[in-house]
Amino acid sequence: MRIALLSYRSKTHCGGQGVYVRHLSRELAELGHDVEVFSGQPYPEGLDPRVRLTKVPSLDLYREPDPFRIPRPSEIKTSIDLEELLTTWTAGFPEPKTFSLRAARVLAGRRGDFDVVHDNQCLGTGLLQIAKMGFPLVATVHHPITRDREVEVAAARWWRKPLVRRWYGFVEMQKRVARQIPELLTVSSASASDILTDFAVSPEQLHVVPLGVDTKLFQPREGRVRNRIIAIASADVPLKGVSHLLHAVARLRVERDVELQLVTKLEPNGPTEKLIAELGISDIVHTSSGLSDEELAALLASAEVACIPSLYEGFSLPAVEAMASGTPIVASRAGALPEVVGPDGECARLVTPADVDELTAVLGRLLDSPRELRRLGDNGRRRAVEVFSWQSVAAQTVAVYEKAIARVAAC
C-alpha cells in the first residue's frame, strides 16, 4: 500500500504528534508498505530510512529563536502565505489550515502516487480538496482541541480571554472538516466520547486505536534516585496541571528531601516560572527540554514516581513510557488517563484533578513505601509490554485504510 502521511508539525519535541508520525511510519514500513511523510516545520527527526520525507515549508512564524518574526516581503509568494501572516498578526493560529492547503497543492500533482492519505490532527480545509481529488482519506484526532480551549479560557484573566478564543479559532474549522471525513482514528475510548460530543461526528466514523511504546528503549534500570519525581508536559499550559504539582512539591519538601525533574519548555517569565520562584522551590525543581529519546528514557527510569497531573489527556504517551520504564505513576483521574494506566492501585494511583491536598498525600505515601513502589512499577512494565505495541497500532491503522479505500472504490 502507498501511504501519504500528513503532519503539520512532526518534530518529537513538539509533543505526541511527532512521536506518532515517527513510530507509525516505521511500523507501516516494517509491514511492507510504502510510506511518505509530508510535514511542515519543525520537520521530523529520526525517521526510518525506508520512510521518505517531503517538506511542506511554511513561513515558520513560530520558529526559535525568533518566534512571531516579521517575514521579508519577498517571502510572501502565495495567497496561503498571506493568510498565514495575517492570521498570526491577528492573534490566530494558522498552521492547521495553511498546512492543509499547501499539502493539497502538493498532492494535486501526485494523484497516481498514493492509495491512501492519512492526516495527523490537522483537520484543515485542504483535506476536503484532497478528498475531492479522489484520494481515500483517513484522519487521526488525538483528542478534540475544544478541551484545551475550555481549560485555557477558564484559566485566563478576563482581558486575555478574547485572545485565547481567537488563538483557538481553528477549532471550528476542525469540527466542520472532521464531520466530512468518513474514517477517523482516535487513541482512546475517552477521546472518542469527547470527539462525539464536541465535534458532533457519528459513532460510525470513529475507530479507536491506542498508541504504543518502545519497550526496548523505555525499560527499568538500576539506580533510581531517592525521592525523585518526574513530570513531562508537552507544553507550558494550564491543561497539563503543572501548577498543582508544584504546590504539592512545595508542601512535600517541608517534611522530606524531594526533587522534581520537570521535562518541558517553560515560557520565559511565564506563570510556571514565576510560580516556582514564588514557592521557593527553584533549588529542587530542575527543568529540561529537547532531550533525546535515550536521555528521556534514562531520566524516566531514574525517578521513583512519575506524576501526570493533567486536567485532561486524550491518551498520554508519558504514562505508557513511565509504565514501560517500571516507574510508578500518580495521575489525575481525567480524560483517558484511567483508561491508559488501568484501575486505581494496579499500575498507578489516581487522584482528583487539581486537588493539591490529595496529590500531596498520595505522593508522600508512595515515597514512603518501597514495596508499593516496586509493585506498581512491576505491574506497569507488564501492562506496557502486553497492551501498548506500535506493531499493533500499525496493523489496526492499515485495517482502517482498507475501509477508506473500499469506500472510495464503491463510489
From Swiss-Prot:
Modes of activity regulation: Activity is significantly enhanced in the presence of Mg(2+).
Query: Temperature effects?
Result: Optimum temperature is 40 degrees Celsius.
Signal peptide feature range: none
Q: Which reaction does it catalyse?
A: [3-O-methyl-alpha-D-mannosyl-(1->4)](n)-3-O-methyl-D-mannose + GDP-alpha-D-mannose = alpha-D-mannosyl-(1->4)-[3-O-methyl-alpha-D-mannosyl-(1->4)](n)-3-O-methyl-D-mannose + GDP + H(+); [3-O-methyl-alpha-D-mannosyl-(1->4)](n)-1-O,3-O-dimethyl-alpha-D-mannose + GDP-alpha-D-mannose = alpha-D-mannosyl-(1->4)-[3-O-methyl-alpha-D-mannosyl-(1->4)](n)-1-O,3-O-dimethyl-alpha-D-mannose + GDP + H(+)
How activity varies with pH is as follows: Optimum pH is 8.5.
- Print the keywords alphabetically: Carbohydrate metabolism, Glycosyltransferase, Transferase
Q: Name one GO molecular function term.
A: D-inositol-3-phosphate glycosyltransferase activity
An example Gene Ontology biological process: lipopolysaccharide biosynthetic process
Please state the Enzyme Commission number of this protein.
Answer: 2.4.1.393
Q: Which InterPro entries match?
A: Glyco_trans_1, Glyco_trans_4-like_N
Gene3D superfamilies the UniProt entry points to: Glycogen Phosphorylase B
Q: Pfam families under this entry?
A: Glyco_transf_4, Glycos_transf_1
Name the protein family.
Answer: Belongs to the glycosyltransferase group 1 family. Glycosyltransferase 4 subfamily.
Query: What exactly does this protein do?
Result: Glycosyltransferase involved in the biosynthesis of 3-O-methylmannose polysaccharides (MMP), which are intracellular polymethylated polysaccharides implicated in the modulation of fatty acid metabolism in non-tuberculous mycobacteria. Highly specific alpha-(1->4)-mannosyltransferase that can transfer mannose units from GDP-mannose to a wide range of alpha-(1->4) oligomannosides longer than three mannoses, including all hydrolytic products of MmpH.
Query: What's the name of the protein?
Result: MMP alpha-(1->4)-mannosyltransferase
Q: Which organism is it from?
A: Mycolicibacterium hassiacum (strain DSM 44199 / CIP 105218 / JCM 12690 / 3849) (Mycobacterium hassiacum)
